[in-house]
Amino acid sequence: MRPMLVRLHRWFGLGTAAFLFLAGLTGAVIAWDHELDALLNPTFFRSATPGTPLPALELAKRLEAEEPHAVVTFMPLSVESGHTWIAQVAPRLNPASQAPYALDFNQVALDPVTGEEQGRRMWGKASLARQNLIPFLYQLHYTLFMPTKMGIDFGVWTMGVVGMVWLLDGFIAIVLAFPNLKSWRKSLAFRVKRGGYALTFDLHRSGGVWLWGLLIVVAVTSISMNLGTQVVRPVVSVFSTLAPDPFRIVAPGPALTPAEATAARERIVAEAAGMGRREGITAPPGGLFGLPTSGVYGVGYFEAGNDHGDAGLGNAWLIMNARTGQVLGRQIPGRGSAGDIFMQAQFPLHSGRIAGLPGRIAISITGVVVAMLSVTGVLIWLKKARARRKPAKQAKAASTIGTRERAAN
């Protein structure tokens, strides 16, 4: 049994090493994506104009008036003092061709007091420019910038499958790390003084053992992040009833016209606080996303600046029918079945935000360890492969010499 597990561990590890090395390093960085992005791009994120911010709806109107081919798809409903108002936008459809207009940006930062633009960018663009660096790393972490063809997002599927292989390999690795109970101490030790191959081996084995629990959590949540709908939700639904995913709800009826979308946006923002109170949500309305093509708007409930959710299970969201205002779906942290709460926990666990600052630090360390395990695993394989080839070469050389001697006689 053990020889078979060793072979499986070897080939699973080699097959996923490059992907996990990349995911580990990028994950260690993007655990701090908002802070690093703001540090690299102060003009995009900071605003110095004193005064009372304009209402979010007014800022959205000004942006869409300035860029008539763009529609705001997400906007904060309030901003922190000294910060810009940053909106996500998407291209409108050309009424003549029914094709989207070409836009070279999808994110815009405005001074919330004056409404003046402070910057724009294509979030997720494959670029190492300072303005694009952190979003680039984020996209690289989740999609590898692989293409989407025939409706299949190959990057998401690749990382999801890598996560499943990694999860299985994690259980194989822990079995191999403890061959017997008597030698358990060796599986936790690092032979630092010996260095060389001994230390490389211990970094791989013992490093994985010490953080095994965190590694399993990251592996499971990586599957959820990529293949939640295709794999995780069907599996979880076997054990627990799941409410429909609120972020995949589509309202009945045709796509909203621009006028209908604007009117619905204004109505839902006006009613958001009351709807939140009726649902027992204590946080204020903090953000609005709209999908005119699917006929829904969603309101997130959080304090200004906490759109990414700093702790716990994240923020509450209500998804409404844009035409009627009816609540079609909800995600309220801690509510629902055991399966619903499990699904709510996936991103907070994967990002470490479930435990606040300590959790994010732990995730950064785990990302570096994942990269280290990938490198040391390949180094161990190379050394053993060379060791296996050496006797074979010696035997071949001896056979060649013997053949020559027989030929000479």
Language-model regions, residue ranges each:
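Conserved histidines in hydrophobic membrane contexts and catalytic metal-binding motifs
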Residues: M1-N409
